[in-house]
């Protein structure tokens, strides 16, 4: 018998779609229409749900990074609005999916009021639903904790591609939900990783002692 993580406890099976919906509710646009540095830590503990090919997979956000529009050289929007970065300028509550190093697709969620640039990179998830499907998508993962412990890993796990770029995550097939009964946890704020500029900015957040983060 394999033990999988469930919201708030352990179980020998992962959440069904019905259980997931009954325990959570959709985030509205007002949640995202706030400063990026407020949205990034507040996304911890929220649930990303993706429905594709008749399958539902989901994971709890355990690690995020904030990227600002002004004065943040690591942000894609640092040089202004372009065809590839226009989604970052709003409206809030949409997905920004891009290809990194020509190999890995990364999922970001847009924050700030419409017209202002800001997004949150989702760095790691704790798998909650559709785990068998996730395992098929991540056959090289040797441990449950490695299924979605990184930006490129989690998009593979969720089945999210650049086809979801610009998707409204307050409705549709790719959504972000919150627990009806929120759990409590401590949050660690530290510097971002995997970038070459603006590395000293403390814009990375993760759930303390959560084993699914990419790097404590």
Q: What is each PLM-predicted segment?
A:
Residues 8-216:
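Conserved, well-structured core segments that form or line functional sites
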């Amino acid at each position: 018998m394999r033990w999988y993580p469930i919201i708030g406890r352990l179980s020998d099976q992962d959440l069904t779609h019905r259980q997931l919906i009954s325990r959570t509710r959709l985030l509205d646009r007002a949640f995202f229409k706030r400063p990026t540095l407020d949205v990034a830590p507040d996304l911890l503990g929220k649930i990303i749900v993706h429905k594709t090919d008749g399958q539902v997979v989901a994971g709890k956000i355990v690690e995020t990074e904030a990227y600002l529009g002004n004065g943040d050289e690591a942000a894609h929007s640092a040089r202004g609005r372009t065809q590839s970065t226009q989604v970052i300028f709003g409206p809030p509550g949409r997905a920004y999916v891009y290809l990194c190093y020509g190999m890995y697709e990364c999922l970001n969620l847009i924050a700030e009021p419409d017209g202002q640039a800001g997004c949150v990179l989702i760095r790691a998830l704790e798998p909650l639903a559709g785990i068998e499907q996730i395992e098929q998508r991540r056959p090289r993962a040797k441990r449950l904790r490695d299924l979605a412990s990184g930006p490129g890993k989690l998009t593979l796990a969720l089945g999210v591609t650049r086809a979801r770029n610009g998707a409204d995550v307050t409705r549709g097939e790719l959504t972000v939900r919150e627990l009806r009964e929120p759990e409590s946890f401590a949050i660690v704020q530290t510097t971002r990783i995997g970038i070459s500029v603006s590395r000293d900015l403390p814009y990375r957040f993760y759930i303390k002692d959560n084993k699914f983060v990419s790097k404590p």
